[in-house]
Amino acid sequence: MNKFNYGIRIPIANNVVIPVNKIGRGDVVVFAYPENESVSFIKRIVALPGDTIEYRDKKLTINCQPVPKTPKGNDEYIENTPMGQVNMQPIVLEEKLGVHTYPVYQLPQAPTFSPQVVRPKVLQEAACQYEGNVAFTCKVPAGHYFAMGDNRDNSDDSRYWGFVPDKNIVGKAF
């Protein structure tokens, strides 16, 4: 991880004092988990401050522009359940966001997201509107980012716990 890629920060407050590079769409970053800042998370930044993000029927749109995806094939995906193992075949897509191209894994039979695990504070924020388990739209507030995992149907990310504050950014993953 490069702690200085996005700037030199003041310790403890974690405010940038000497900016270096800006966080870009598609960057993979390490950050302090907003619900427990002693835990580090690594996710892909898909939306920047001021962006409007829509995720509908597993299709990502940023500022009314669809994020390009092309099929790449299937990979084996195994998920443990209380009843044993279930073997499912995800669709592997190649997504292009900003200057980054990367694989995204989706399970065709899984919902777009699971509203029952969206944290109450996220549901109360006026920044996001949810439509059952098929779609949501969010306006990213100033000083925050929207992060998603590449394993889209099995990722604990901004869909569930909200935006990543800039002060929580630790650095860029290599």
Regions from the PLM with identified roles:
Residues 1-174:
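Soluble "head" domains of membrane/secretory-pathway proteins
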